[in-house]
Amino acid sequence: MAKKKIYSDIEFPTEIVAESKSAYGLKTYISLFSSAGVGCYGFKQEGYYCIATVELLERRLNVQKCNNKCAYNSGYICGDMTEQSTKDKIFRELDIWKHGFGVDDLDVLIATPPCQGMSVANHKKKDELKRNSLVVESILMVKSITPKFFIFENVRAFLTSVCTDLDGNDKSIREAIEANLSGLYNISYNVLNFKDYGNPSSRTRTLVIGVRKDLKEITPYDVFPDKQPEQTLRQVIGDMPSLQTMGEICPDDIYHNFRKYAPRMEAWISEIKEGQSAFDNTEISRIPHTVKDGVIVYNAQKNGDKYTRQYWDKVAPCIHTRNDIMASQNTVHPVDNRVFSIREVMRMMSVPPTFKWSEQSLEELNALSVKEKEAYLKKEEINIRHTLGEAVPTIIFKQIAHKVRKVLCRSTLSEQEIKNLIEKRNLTDAAKLIEFIKKSTTHTFAELSKIAELANAQHDNNAAYYTRQDLCFTIVSSLPIPKGQTTVNILEPSIGVGNFLPTLIRKYESATEVNIDVVDIDANSIAILKELVQKIYVPVNVHITYINDDFLLHQFDKKYDVVVGNPPYMKLTKEKKLLAQYKAEAYNKNTNNIFAFFIEKAIKIGKFVSLIVPKSLINAPEFNDTRELIGQNAIRRIIDFGEKGFKGVKIETICLQVDTVAKQSDTVVESYITDEVECHPQSYITSSEYPYWLIYRNAEFDKVADRLTFNVFKSYRDRTITKAITKPTGRIRVLKSRNIGDNTIIDIPDYDSYIDDVNNLDVAKYLNQTECVLLPNLTYNPRACFMPKGCIADGSVAILTPNENETITEQDLAFYATELFSHFYAIARNRGSRSLNIDNNSVYFFGKLKHTTL
């Protein structure tokens, strides 16, 4: 055992320390509301270490101890998740693993908060618990710990149930998850029946999986359980011995038992066949009833599956908490006159035989006398059955655990390795690239498509760049699923090598028919794509049509439900004839950048448009008309990737999602810069009050705006002064950005520049114009001063000319240097990192104080 000074009283097992230093390190998780640990036993099976497990009921936590779930006894936390003391215990365990084993980044957080108020099965729960505070506590723990993955599992109605969010407002649980976690995580929301994913019984549940956005190329789809054929009840328990005597316990398995019930009830089920209920009996005496004061009172049949004998050759029924009584749902054995035994229920919930309910081994329990077995079952059976009815099937979490480990441990090719591979195999030759893809058995689709994108000889000419799978998921997860349609028509207008296809197919695979038309101007890209498609699963209901043509000139004969993609960003300067063709149909004729033309055409032929485009769309004067056109539609979502969209490409990007059919309402802004998601009325962030969209606009921005009168300057920047024409001394000083201080000029040795003659320079018109204001051009920390006599400024400084009749004071300029204005200005510039030039749009925000007091 090793010891760490900071926790001198704690021993750190050397085998765990050794594993923590291995190539792949430890895999860890925390489980909240873990009950007996049936579900997360799947993580133990996959070799994960449980840092902490939290359960309110000690008897259930004790079951977890029987299975040696945690390395430290302190990891078993019996407590209420609404209490700070419970949370503090979790954070202490995290700290122990951080200092003892170097675990500073939790892999998985699991939360299965009690579903009180959400179950559709229990008619007695009439008053929905609006707060659902335990769900909110789960969200808060994810926010606090920020694990790589989080998993929420709950009942079917989970996402639509109401909770009081952290902001104090009532909203659906899905909205609360979105508001708090979707800035940091890619999240999939699924209501599914676990019988289709490896569980031996029917169980319709909600499964929410979040993947932290800094995990490149990993999406929730990568860790989702696999679809598998259904199993029949006969396949699951048909080999188990029949139990026909009430109270009988299988000698080889204490958990295969005939649970006793009132003998008079046997007649209610003894004559019914598979699929029949005791209420179907024709003899009145065999219909479930009670006798009160000598009067027969027949039982109510609220749930139609009470006292119902199950089918051998159908999927096993859903296991509920009261699987111990026939009056519950679907609990009667297909042949025997009894409810399912504990072991049968365990099998139906995919709980492996290695799972322990007691400190005693199965062999020890089986060796007990009959009376001792009966005493043990009397004490433990209800707890076991109830926990099984509330549990997540072990196989579901086991699959997720396996896949999480796989994606975290898989080796990926670096960009340099890909470049070396391309050079070594001469993959710039399209034929050789296609052959390489065809023969590849070890590379993922993401790796192959990245290789293909980088290898394509037309890469730079077509302005095409690889779109990571995690970014594709971010975009595709927000796309709508058309209601009431059996056929979904999708268009990818610049498909490249098909980066969006895997996520699009997964998103829409449940539709009856999916038609995906893919367009690319490059024939090589289409040929390569066809080979890449062979590497992904394409269901029979998904049809891909390849169109080798110029999207902007192609004639489409239908309206698409979704247009999604990453169009090229490039200005046409030499191909005048082609540009004229594009502009002939364009609304915005003031730009030569073809992505703007892609937006316009997509809006014409698509009901819902989702395109990755340069962030300059939001604010550049060049795209004023494009914004006007877009604003006539419902802007559903803007995802700000900043510079995180494309590695090695010095461009900021956004994803614009526009609904061309619906009415305008709210716009969601999802930011990779702030890791937050906000929602505002579209009219608020696209207000004509300002010269361009303000996607980060908020109340603090508005407070500062109320203090200023805007639109008081015109902006100018020199484009001709370079180092070649300046010198260390001279007649006229050339001011640069670092020379500009707060109402002062800063002298900087070996930095200051001069020029003798400006007569041939356009900037000469500002010489001695002392009312002009100077501002450093590219900064979020503005400061300003007036133009001194005998000076001009180079292009690193914006020269602001006050409008006629405007008087600017030093107090106005001093306000620009305040922290308050700096925050305001960051929002005014949409938190951009590159598009910070002060142009005649952005100069609008350098206003004049309405009152002179700072």
Residue spans of the language-model regions?
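Signature of N6-adenine DNA methyltransferases within the class I
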Residues: 174, 178, 188-190, 196-210, ...
